[in-house]
Amino acid sequence: MTEHYEVTVVGGGPAGLTAALYTTRLGHKTAVINRGGGRAAMMLDTHNVIGVTEEVSGNEFLQTAVEQVKSYGADYYQDLVVDIDQTDDGYRLTAGDTEVTSEHVVLATGFSDERPDPPLPRTGRGLHWCLHCDAYMFVDEPVFVMGTDDSAAHVAMIMLNFTSDVDLLTRGEEPEWSEETAALLESHPIEVVHEEIVGMEKDDDGWLTAFVFEDGTIEEYRGGFPMYGSDYNTDLAESLGVERNDDGTIAVDDHGRTNVDGVYAVGDVTPGHNQIPTAMGEGARCGIGNHYDLRAFPRSAEEIEEQGPVTEADVPGISEELLRHAVAHEGHAGGARNDRVATGDD
């Protein structure tokens, strides 16, 4: 039998899981379908998240979040959604081993960082993708920024706030930044290195220590930032007719609503800073927005005229399944009521 939900979140990063946490705790039957991986899962350490110590890895952070969401009654599927079809009363989501129907869909599909081409050897330590997350790590250290466009040049200049030793590496490609940006670069103490990288040196712990360039020179770096843009995961959004912005992100309102009724988007696939705390905030707003659009009460004057007054038999609005979870949860007022028989139980 195909399971039906009020809200189904596609993606299991900080934004999607926070949205699911809110919709579940606000009384809506919720599912998360997550393929796994993602930018947050790749983190060796967690930075800039109040209450989470830095030695917590991305996988540990996300696993804790998944367990929290499940503890409140949400269902979690490890699967890849390949298709979303509109139905008469919502949406049908098809994944490899999973098919569900849902009144609302939250797209939390994120993006992938564009990698250098040709690719560099992976170090795991020294190639970084988030300036606001990791710039602090390189205070007073030699740093590179890699790329040929305006954003790469501007990031190189931004890094001068943290260190005096910044190189901008074009890897043999012609710069594509504007004349205005070129003039700015000339007025900042940044060395532009045009030679291609042919090798990498690492220390015993696997941290990058230097790049070897095509002309034989060796330059020491503690780390840096490849800046080649983002590839937004919007295939599902496009199939639903969801509007996108010029930069490829999904256009949303303050609560994550898209131009398609019942479809929301949140996190890195939408405009804004690609940070865990901001993603969590967006997820919270999106979850609340879903609640605004789904909650049964208060009935409007038009609904009362059509359906009649709200009776005791109509309330509470929370589903019986989530009611059972709520009264048995350790967070329930007065403690978990495991001995309580929920509405609908024999």
Whereabouts are the PLM-identified features?
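FAD-binding core/adjacent interface of flavoenzyme oxidoreductases
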Residues: 2-5, 76-141, 223, 250-254
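FAD-site-proximal beta/loop scaffold in flavoenzymes
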Residues: 121-137, 228-277, 288, 292
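A Rossmann-like FAD-binding core segment of flavoenzymes
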Residues: 69-87, 93-94, 100-102, 163-250, ...
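N-terminal glycine-rich dinucleotide-binding loop that anchors FAD/FMN and/or NAD(P) in oxidoreductases
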Residues: 29-31, 35-37, 44-71, 130, ...
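Beta1-alpha1 glycine-rich phosphate/pyrophosphate-binding loop at the start
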Residues: 3-60, 147, 153-175
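Redox-cofactor binding/interface segments in oxidoreductases and associated redox assembly factors
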Residues: 10, 107-108, 145, 213, ...
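A short, charged, Gly/Pro-tolerant segment at domain boundaries
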Residues: 82-87, 294-346
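A conserved FAD-binding loop/helix module that cradles the flavin
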Residues: 20, 155, 266-320
